[in-house]
Regions:
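Left-handed beta-helix
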Residues: 2-135, 285-529
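N-terminal nucleotide-binding beta1-loop-alpha1 segment
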Residues: 130-153
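Short helix-terminating capping/connector loops at secondary-structure junctions
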Residues: 132-134, 181-185, 259-264
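Structured alpha-helical segments in the cores of large, soluble enzyme domains
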Residues: 139-143, 165-177, 246-258, 387
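"Short basic amphipathic alpha-helical interaction patches in structured regions
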Residues: 152-158, 203-204
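Metallocofactor- and cofactor-centric catalytic cores in central/energy metabolism, strongly enriched
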Residues: 156-169, 176, 180, 190, ...
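Short internal beta-strands
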Residues: 188-193, 297
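Conserved core of the sugar-phosphate nucleotidyltransferase
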Residues: 198-361
């Protein structure tokens, strides 16, 4: 049996708890589309209502039912819970009807006044409210990623980012500080994948936490439309359907009920690689005082964020719009900073009691993101859902604009250099503070720095960037101790040459390297890059 959504307990949070979803094998082989796979009568009735109201003819429904049968069979044989099968059918039906799942530009409008609350408008008294409400809080970190974009084969959260501390080590310090600050044993939950679990557990052997696994669903063979088959490695037939699966995983694993039974009513969720996403008690206080069901943190969009998800108005609701939901001819508009001014940090706050009530009606009907992939030469499709898309599923959900220092992602080695540099002051409690008010520097590294291993060989000591606005490094360059970049700097090393930098300051210049390896600094000229 493969990984089902389940809970593992590491440490002494809730001794004696034997939670976890016990899988069952459904006896519904060759299932017609009659909801035979759903055992709960009330849930089956809701499923049938959903099916009957689909905007399809009888012939189209028959074709769709035939198409879905193979997936229902495969999920059933994998002991998948009813709600996951329903949600998979729901995603595939959306894909069947819309195919590309793009939102027409004509249906999109910008946010209106009042759609987003400025963090600065929240009164300081909410800190006290949040501290009192902290006994009802749990913190969850999304820890399923391998960091493949940086050539990392292990969990991204185990990359060293400051001295000997990894992301997870710093998160552990942040949680320790939070517990001391509030006086409550706030649980830490890690949403792991089968790719990250073992390495994470080995690293965190001394820290108590809860482990939650996502569901997995079958990949779609693009050519046949059937579940993808891989004879080399059956694991490659499956994938986790995006962070939007968290909501169902919480329910079917048993964790949602257990948290509620333990008096936990709020869950703060963020990416493990975003060390700026500490638990801010003022935000918790606002959620508690206003009885908000769902709250998303957004931040002002910059040129570096133009590909990130943004908030829009669609069908009179505030919705999340991801790049994958945008037609190619609309991408320029999507990236227009004047029209779409904020983007999603993927940090959300969830009222667990309201989530439970909502899920008793069936899975959240979240937008579907089509993610094309290639596995061993076969073109496949993954249907995914975004965590933040749930903002449209809750009446009374809000977005709040937070300071930029609450969003410190690491997607590339350029991000890693910025995080490791002195641009951020790393406090003992694990929090980060920009050392300068200059704004976020732009850092561009060439292919020689593109993977973590090569980066670590070249960046022996992180450079000083606290007075930097723009840095571009091209070529085979090694950074040793006491290297500073200030203002705008572009250093280009020709092929077949290697430059070692140590105890050197570069300020507002373009650096050339001659055939003898000597550096020559020319004054910075705009657009000289």
């Amino acid at each position: 049996m493969r990984h089902a959504a389940r809970v593992e307990i590491h440490g002494a949070f809730w001794n004696g708890y034997s939670g976890g979803w016990v899988g069952r094998l459904l006896h519904a082989i060759n299932i017609p589309m009659n909801a035979a796979f759903i055992r709960d009568p009330a849930l089956r009735e809701r499923y049938l209502t959903w099916w009957q109201t689909l905007p399809l003819s009888d012939a189209e429904k028959e074709a769709l039912a035939t198409h879905l049968t193979a997936y229902i069979q495969k999920l059933s044989l994998n002991n998948s819970p009813d709600l996951l099968i329903w949600n998979t059918c729901q995603m595939m039906t959306t894909h069947f009807i819309q195919h590309e799942n793009w939102i027409p530009e004509s249906e999109i409008s910008a946010l209106e006044d009042g759609d987003v609350i400025p963090f600065e408008s929240l009164p300081d008294t909410l800190e006290i409210v949040g501290k009192q409400a902290a006994k009802h809080l749990a913190v969850l970190k999304l820890n399923g990623g391998l960091g493949t974009t940086m050539g990392c084969s292990g969990p991204k959260s185990l990359i060293h980012v400051h001295l000997n501390d990894t992301f997870i080590d710093i998160i552990s310090k942040q949680m320790h500080t939070l517990r001391q600050q509030t006086g409550h044993a706030i649980p830490l939950i890690l949403l792991n994948s089968f790719n990250t679990s073992d390495a994470t557990l080995a690293h965190l052997s001394d820290m108590p936490f809860l482990e939650l696994f996502q569901h997995e669903v079958p990949r779609i063979d693009t050519e046949t439309g059937k579940p993808y088959v891989c004879h080399r490695d059956k694991n490659l037939e499956w994938y986790p359907p995006g962070h939007g699966d968290l909501y169902l995983s919480l329910l079917t694993s048993g964790m949602l009920d257990t948290l509620i039974q333990k008096g936990i009513g709020y869950l703060f969720v963020s990416n493990a690689d975003n060390l700026g996403a500490t638990t801010h008690l003022k935000l918790l206080g606002h959620m508690h005082e206003k009885k908000i069901p769902f709250m998303m943190e957004v931040t002002p969009k910059t040129l570096t964020d133009i590909k990130g998800g943004t908030l829009i108005r669609h069908q009179n609701r505030v919705c999340l719009l991801e790049r994958a939901q945008v037609a190619p001819e609309f991408l320029d508009t999507f990236e227009d900073l004047a029209r779409f001014t904020v983007f999603n940090t993927n940090s959300v706050w969830i009222n667990l009691d309201i989530l439970k009530q909502r899920l008793t009606q069936g899975p959240l009907k979240l937008p579907v993101i089509v993610n094309p992939k290639q596995v061993h030469g076969t073109h496949v499709v993954q249907l995914e859902q975004a965590l933040g898309a749930a903002i449209e599923a809750f009446n009374g959900a809000v977005a709040i604009t937070v300071p930029r220092d609450r969003f410190v992602p690491v997607k590339t080695t350029s991000d890693l250099m910025l995080l490791q540099s002195d641009y951020y002051t790393k406090r003992l409690d694990g929090s980060l503070q920009p050392a300068s008010q200059r704004g976020l520097p732009t850092v561009i590294l060439s292919k020689e720095f593109s993977n973590v291993s090569a980066y670590q060989q070249r960046v022996v000591y992180p450079p000083s960037l606290k007075h930097c606005d723009y840095l571009r490094l091209d070529g085979d360059i090694t950074l040793l101790d006491r290297v500073k970049f200030e203002g705008h700097v572009h250093l280009h090393v020709p092929p077949a040459q290697h430059v070692v930098l140590e105890n050197k300051t570069f300020k507002n210049c373009r650096v050339r390297v001659d055939k003898h390896g000597q550096l020559h600094e020319d004054p910075w000229v705009p657009d000289s890059t």
